[in-house]
UniProtKB/Swiss-Prot annotation:
GO terms for cellular component: small ribosomal subunit. PROSITE patterns: RIBOSOMAL_S4, S4. It comes from Brucella suis biovar 1 (strain 1330). Residues 19-45 are annotated as: Disordered. Part of the 30S ribosomal subunit. Contacts protein S5. The interaction surface between S4 and S5 is involved in control of translational fidelity. Keywords: Ribonucleoprotein, Ribosomal protein, RNA-binding, rRNA-binding. GO terms for molecular function: rRNA binding; structural constituent of ribosome. GO terms for biological process: ribosomal small subunit biogenesis; translation. Residues 94-157 form the S4 RNA-binding domain. HAMAP family: Ribosomal_uS4_B (MF_01306_B). It holds the Pfam family S4. This is Small ribosomal subunit protein uS4. Belongs to the universal ribosomal protein uS4 family.
């Protein structure tokens, strides 16, 4: 595995789970046999440990966003009416980087963040270079004309490992996506189990 790939999958290795469902993730195989290289059996996590792990997993999925930004998103979710965990998922999935990734304009969430930073994306006809930009229902996200033939875009469209969720309409011929509705937890095609209720418990301590 190259140095670049190693950095990309450090979150998977840290959590011991393939959180994006990528075929090349190192956790898909045992690197060493049991007991070798000082591996130890992990003890049972405390309630705090379980809650912390749930937070790290959800935060990591969206590109390991900063604790400050993640907590701010949680606090906004808590202020809204309804279930805080469901609100949290809806807010995270309405981020521009999440929608660019979900629409299969790029292969990874990290690529989505870089793609946006470099000015390759329009929202409602205007260039937006803020990863955390919050989309509203009905917003149209488009890959800019000069960027549509980039290798990273052409690669992502062909990925068979994930499908576009039904809360996003995509035309890959035009490279345009429409954010149709705010999803709940059961709508989101996570590759592993996410537990926003435990994240709520973590911040409610």
């Amino acid at each position: 595995m190259s140095k670049r790939e190693s950095a990309k999958y450090k979150i998977d290795r840290r959590l011991g789970e393939n959180i994006w469902g990528r075929p090349k993730s190192p956790v898909n195989r045992r690197e060493y046999g049991p007991g070798q290289h000082g591996q130890r059996r992990k003890g049972k996590l405390s309630d705090f440990g379980v809650q912390l792990r749930a937070k790290q997993k959800l935060k990591g999925f969206y590109g390991d966003i900063s604790e400050k930004q993640f907590r701010k998103t949680y606090e906004e979710a808590a202020r809204r009416k309804g279930d805080t965990g469901e609100n949290l998922i809806g807010l995270l999935e309405s981020r521009l980087d999440a929608v660019v990734y979900r629409a299969k304009f790029v292969p990874t969430i990290f690529a989505a963040r870089q793609f946006i930073n470099h000015g390759h994306v329009n929202v409602n006809g205007r260039r937006v270079n803020i990863q955390s930009y919050r989309l509203k229902v009905g917003d149209v996200v488009e890959v800019r004309e000069k960027s549509k033939q980039l290798a990273i875009v052409l690669e992502a469209v062909q990925l068979a490992e994930r499908d576009v969720p039904d809360y996003i309409d995509v035309d890959h011929n035009k490279m345009v996506a429409t954010y149709n509705r705010v999803p709940g937890l059961l709508d989101v095609p996570y590759a592993v189990q996410m537990e926003p209720n435990l994240v709520v418990e973590f911040y409610s301590r």
